[in-house]
Regions:
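Structural beta-sheet core signal
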Residues: 51-53, 80, 135
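C-terminal helical cap/extension that packs against the catalytic core
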Residues: 69-129
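Hydrophobic, well-ordered secondary-structure elements that form the walls
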Residues: 26, 78, 133
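Nucleotide phosphate-binding/pyrophosphate-handling subdomain across enzymes
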Residues: 4-74
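Short amphipathic alpha-helical segments
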Residues: 36, 63-65, 91-92, 124, ...
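Short glycine-rich anion-binding loops that position phosphate/pyrophosphate groups of nucleotides
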Residues: 55-58, 83-86, 138-141
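A glycine-rich beta-strand to alpha-helix segment
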Residues: 118-149, 154
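Short, solvent-exposed amphipathic alpha-helical segments in soluble enzyme
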Residues: 39-42, 66-70, 94-96, 129, ...
Length: 154
C-alpha cells in the first residue's frame, strides 16, 4: 500500500478515449523528471506523443527555461498551459508563452492554451489512433485527463 501511495501521479494511467488513445498523468515539475517521462514514453509503442505541461512556479520556470524546452522537445505535440504559481507572485517577468517561445527557438513547435476544457477539446479533435497523451505538472493540469477519457466524452 505504501508503494502504491508513493507512486501516485507518476506515469499514472488515467484511461483511454476514441478507443485506443491512452492518457497518463504525472506530477513531474523539473526538467530531469520530464526527460525521464519522455524516455519512458518513447519506449512505448505509440503513434504520436502529446504532452500538456503546466510549469510549476515562476522562479523555477525562469531559472530552468531552456532546460524545460530541451526536456519537452522529444514530444510530437506540446501544449503549454499557465504557470501554476503555488505561493509565488510573478515578480520574475515570466509567462507560459516564454516557454513556448523557447521551445520554438530550439526548432520544435509548441502551443499555449490556458483553458483546460479547450485543451481537452483540441486534443480530442486532433489525436489519432495509438497516440499517447500525458498531462504533466504539480498543479491543476491533472484535471485534464479525466476530461479526455471515454466515460467523460461529449
Amino acid at each position: 500500500m505504501c508503494i502504491r501511495d508513493s507512486a501516485h501521479r507518476r506515469y499514472e494511467f488515467v484511461g483511454t478515449f476514441h478507443g485506443n488513445i491512452s492518457v497518463f498523468d504525472d506530477y513531474a515539475h523539473h526538467p530531469t523528471e520530464i526527460q525521464a517521462i519522455a524516455n519512458a514514453t518513447m519506449q512505448k509503442k505509440h503513434n504520436k506523443a502529446w504532452i500538456v505541461f503546466q510549469p510549476h512556479t515562476y522562479s523555477r520556470t525562469k531559472n530552468l527555461l531552456h532546460d524545460f524546452a530541451k526536456a519537452l522537445a522529444p514530444f510530437d505535440n506540446i501544449i503549454i498551459t499557465d504557470i501554476y504559481a503555488a505561493r509565488e507572485k510573478n515578480t520574475f517577468d515570466i509567462s507560459a508563452q516564454d516557454l513556448v517561445d523557447e521551445i520554438t527557438k530550439i526548432g520544435r513547435k509548441a502551443i499555449y492554451m490556458s483553458n483546460f476544457e479547450e485543451i481537452a477539446k483540441y486534443i480530442k479533435d486532433h489525436a489519432i489512433n495509438n497516440d499517447i497523451v500525458l498531462t504533466v505538472g504539480a498543479g491543476t493540469v491533472t484535471k485534464i485527463g479525466p476530461m479526455l477519457v471515454d466515460n467523460h466524452e461529449d
